[in-house]
């Protein structure tokens, strides 16, 4: 594997199992994703939560769109897959028992505007959520804030969005996290979950 890829994957804080992969996406690709998301307004929906995919603005307020399975986003789907595969290879190299086999469950893009948020939550659970092994979030733009960070309560970690950065972390009860309420600017992310095949 490319040594440069391994060097770019760092653990945010020792023992946190929150990994950052800077420049996982090129600036031009991030800008293209944002532009194409904004031009697909008819496919946007209010952010959903839980296994029943319900709207609950007490927990999450954002504008989301699934891009996987759409012909006009196939190139973006492949770009995210390639980025994720490189990062997973680096994680596997560091942790012998993180062997898979794994796959993603498809990709979505999310926009958060001032006053919006994703309050404290975890990304695992029973039934169809039980296969989830990692959360993947790509930041598609720089967010000066205040607000917009990804914050982890048990690890005392707060990550500021930086264009092109990918973060990976476990979805379990150990990693309760939130998207801090954005007070200024607009935040764009792409997301997926890594699951067992």
Where are these regions (language model features)?
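Non-heme Fe(II)/2-oxoglutarate
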Residues: 2-99
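Catalytic core of non-heme Fe(II) oxygenases with the double-stranded beta-helix
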Residues: 71, 78-197
């Amino acid at each position: 594997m490319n040594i440069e890829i391994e060097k770019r994957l760092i653990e945010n804080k020792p023992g946190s199992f929150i990994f950052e992969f800077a420049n996982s996406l090129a600036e031009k690709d991030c800008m293209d994703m944002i532009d194409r998301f904004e031009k697909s307004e008819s496919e946007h929906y209010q952010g959903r939560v839980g296994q029943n995919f319900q709207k609950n603005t007490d927990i999450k307020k954002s504008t989301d769109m699934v891009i996987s399975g759409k012909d006009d986003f196939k190139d973006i789907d492949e770009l995210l897959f390639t980025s994720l595969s490189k990062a997973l290879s680096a994680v596997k190299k560091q942790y012998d028992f993180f062997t898979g086999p794994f796959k993603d469950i498809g990709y979505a893009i999310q926009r958060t505007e001032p006053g919006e948020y994703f309050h404290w939550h975890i990304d695992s659970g029973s039934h169809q959520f039980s296969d989830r092994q990692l959360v993947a979030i790509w930041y598609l733009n720089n967010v000066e804030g205040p607000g917009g960070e990804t914050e982890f309560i048990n690890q005392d970690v707060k990550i500021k969005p930086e264009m092109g950065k990918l973060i990976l972390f476990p979805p379990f009860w150990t990693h309760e996290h939130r998207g801090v309420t954005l007070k200024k600017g607009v935040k764009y992310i792409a997301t997926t979950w890594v699951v067992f095949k």
